[in-house]
């Protein structure tokens, strides 16, 4: 009995140490980011001036809210509130926008409002209702859009119980999945083509399909963020769950021995190096799937290896290496290295925080 008790103490100690390491890494890179971008109202300046409500920054705030969930520091909420207040709780380019990239910031508006009771969702509701009123479901012509916009609609359904939001999200998702370019989801291989330009006959140089890591990561994260808002017995949850499981089965086979996924999931013909953002998003999804009982323990070693890979991306000052710049395929931002600086670094930090926050919860399980 004493031996069993001692073993339990050792295991608990190892778990606590593992959690401490994960939280330390998350804090380190977030502190770096908040120090570098101390004024969240300032526009970004990458080749041109853009407001800080653009999608790259919005993804960062998704990660920050996830970090707050495991590390509830008031300064995270203050930073988020200052950003949201400055942008008047409105999507980029106003309430008439139908661009998913513009709508990504609304995910954080909703989460912050639910958490604190502060802020306004009036502009978000107006924006979504205007888009639904067009009776078009073909706006999401690239798979990144599924992550940027789908969770907004599903979250709005969850708080209003207005089924029209969920119906619109599902119809739009099915259009991208089954019809855009003949269908962006390859059901046989469980992976997504980024948009109609990458559907066959387009191939990588070695003749393999072009499956972009971060693009698939966006969809994987969107499935998590949407299912997380839905009743598990609902038909919509079950529909998304099927795709989540298909993707999980495919993705675990694409992970490399060092824990990374590469920019191209199935082809190393041109870009064989590690890539951080896709790796972080896949960790986010797999850790969540295990915690929800959707994925079995076979996926746990993949999560552990992914954490070690992500840990190796972290510089001493909090900068993240192996972060592929913006683009739409494996060639974007190359060469991607430990020291290369991407055009935008905010979305990469957001992906990192999402992955580590969910892995932290898995360790606590």
Please provide the spans of the model-predicted regions.
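"A position-specific structural signal for the A-helix of alpha-solenoid helical repeats
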Residues: 63, 108, 152-155, 285
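Helix-capping and short linker residues that terminate individual alpha-solenoid repeat units
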Residues: 38, 72, 88-92, 117, ...
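Bacterial Sec-dependent N-terminal signal peptides
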Residues: 1-20
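CBM-like carbohydrate-recognition segments
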Residues: 7, 20-58, 66, 70-86, ...
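Extended ligand-binding clefts on enzyme/binding-domain cores
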Residues: 143-144, 154-265, 272-283, 295-327, ...
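Hydrophobic/aromatic side-chain positions at a characteristic register within alpha-helices
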Residues: 72, 110-113, 154-161
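Short secondary-structure capping/junction motifs at helix and strand boundaries
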Residues: 2-4, 116-125, 136, 163-167
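Asp-box/WD-like beta-propeller blade repeats and closely related beta-sheet repeat scaffolds
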Residues: 120-153
